[in-house]
């Protein structure tokens, strides 16, 4: 099940962030561009929760297996990217920090999260879904076209002001 997060989910969301960073360290594949202690953190989860835009994927027993931030905020670098689907800011939904616990990878959960985000955005009157992902994030860059997203270009950014991170942009008409 995917639902809006509860405050009691926050430690589990932060634990998924850490599990992803641990997995990257263990495999040597640092595909997210994240930096431990800087982004994402428990404070990141709390801030997204406080904004009312944190969603979680949970098992029947309440175990959190993933999360995402779904809002309409585009990074300044991304806002003027190579978008081909015209839309006013109020018509755009954006997925940020979509996470799946590494132990649950390959089960179609990211697809479920994106489908949920699309349905939620449509119910809010949004007409376009956009998101960015690091150019080195092979999983996200492979999944995006497979679920109907169009590559809209690459932008250069210093993500969270700490790391050079070129981002691939994706969009889909809802």
Short names for language-model regions:
Residues 51-68:
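Conserved beta-hairpin
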Residues 73, 132, 145-165:
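Conserved catalytic-core motifs of GNAT/GCN5-like acyltransferases
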Residues 14, 21-43:
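Conserved GNAT-fold acetyl-CoA-binding loop/helix
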Residues 111, 123, 136-153:
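Conserved active-site alpha-helix within GNAT-family acetyltransferase domains
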Residues 114, 121-133:
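Conserved GNAT acetyl-CoA-binding A-motif
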Residues 100, 106-119, 142, 146:
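Conserved acetyl-CoA-binding loop-helix of GNAT-fold acetyltransferases
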Residues 69-97, 105, 158-161:
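Conserved acyl-donor/pantetheine-binding loop and adjacent beta-alpha core of acyl/acetyltransferases
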């Amino acid at each position: 099940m995917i639902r809006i997060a509860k405050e009691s989910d926050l430690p589990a969301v932060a634990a998924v962030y850490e599990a992803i960073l641990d997995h990257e360290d263990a495999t040597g594949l640092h595909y997210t561009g994240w930096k431990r202690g800087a982004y994402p953190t428990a404070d990141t989860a709390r801030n997204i929760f406080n904004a009312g835009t944190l969603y979680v994927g949970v098992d029947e027993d309440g175990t959190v297996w993933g999360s995402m931030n779904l809002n309409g905020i585009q990074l300044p670098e991304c806002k003027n990217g190579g978008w081909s689907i015209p839309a006013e800011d109020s018509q755009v939904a954006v997925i940020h920090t979509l996470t799946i616990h590494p132990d649950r990878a390959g089960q179609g959960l990211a697809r479920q999260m994106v489908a949920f985000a699309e349905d939620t955005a449509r119910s809010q009157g949004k007409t376009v879904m956009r998101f960015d992902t690091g150019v080195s994030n092979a999983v996200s860059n492979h999944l995006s076209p497979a679920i109907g997203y169009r590559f809209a270009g690459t932008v250069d950014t210093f993500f969270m002001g700490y790391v050079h991170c070129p981002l691939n942009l994706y969009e889909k008409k809802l």
